[in-house]
Amino acid sequence: MSQNVISQPVEAQQSFARAVTESLPGLLLVCAVALVASFVAPKLEAYPLFKTYLSLKDFILAIIFGIIIRNTVGVPAVFQPGLRYSTIMTKTGIVIMGSSYSLAGLVSVGAQALVFIAVFLFGTALVMMWLCRKVGMSTPLAACLAAGMSVCGVSATIAIAPAVKAKNEDMAYSIAVVLMFGLLALIAFPLIGKVFNLTPEQFGAFAGVGIVNSAQVLAAGFGFSQEAGIVAGIYNIGRVVFLPFVVLMLAIMAAAQEAEQGNEVAKINKWQMIRDKFPLFVLGFLAIVCLNTAGVLTKPEVKMAKHFMEWAFLLGFASIGLTTRLSDLRAAGLNGFLFGFGVAGLKAALALAAVLLFMS
């Protein structure tokens, strides 16, 4: 009995040490890509093209360099375990980002943000379900596309899939469409922001509702400017807060469509779905905001937190790039690309129009 009790902590320590050892090569690769991106970005600013139009700051370059490495020389298996932490890194950055806001500042940005987000999220989801039905797509595929294109990209697609009994092919198709537009948005959105001379607040809102995938929202926002990245982050948080409610709406719509077709439909537990899909890291962000509002964080600590936030995002984006396989985008095919790009492009155009009209 006592030997078993003693052996458990030892086994846990060995397991932790093994996980660290396995993850180390990948984490070092992520750090190397992030460092190269942070070194190259200021050099590009010396060229008028990049300074005036193409905002290829380190956040965007980290993703681009990662993608180039992954899809040219490849990433050997020994590095794979260390690339699993992209989501943890980006969510850590979002939590730390709370140090940049007080409750009053959050409310001033958040009130308008919630209106924009609600209109675009639910509007996009409803339009996508209607369009997909018109072109004859299956209900599960339609729900996956609607969630991915309206809320937060890949995460939303994964969240809705079990609720609508989506197949792996449905998820792959939806994720491919989301990633294709997200990669294009990394370059196009900052360029559009410069052409229309958007303020950081305007661009943050534009990226926050116009770009499909969460990681690209943050990368494009910080790629435009530090202030725009913070605002885009607030919009991104608002989007993921709405995630369980959009998933619930789509699940109910999908169930209704399946019932119309005479298929058996499982009962939906609404409160359990909302609870299970709620993003807990948002609570961490709000906790940091409250600490900053209460004056617990000193100015040096806030400055240090800003550096931690930047590096958390930079490492997360590098990891995302290193795990992005362009071959996976073939799952959507040409028709899927055109369909998804058309909807995402329309959403982006409407987002730009709304920002110019209501935030001038």
Curated annotation (Swiss-Prot):
Q: Where are the transmembrane segments?
A: 20-42, 57-79, 100-122, 142-164, 171-193, 203-225, 232-254, 278-297, 310-327, 337-359
Quote the subcellular location field of this record.
Cell membrane
The record ties this protein, via InterPro entries, to: UPF0324_pro
The answer, when asked if Acetylation is one of the entry's keywords, is: no
Q: Which GO terms describe its cellular component?
A: plasma membrane
Regarding the membrane, this protein is recorded as: Multi-pass membrane protein
Q: Keywords of this protein's UniProt record, alphabetized?
A: Cell membrane, Membrane, Transmembrane, Transmembrane helix
List where this protein forms a coiled coil.
none
Similarity remark: Belongs to the UPF0324 family.
Question: What is this protein called in UniProt?
Answer: UPF0324 membrane protein DVU_0123
Q: Which organism is it from?
A: Nitratidesulfovibrio vulgaris (strain ATCC 29579 / DSM 644 / CCUG 34227 / NCIMB 8303 / VKM B-1760 / Hildenborough)
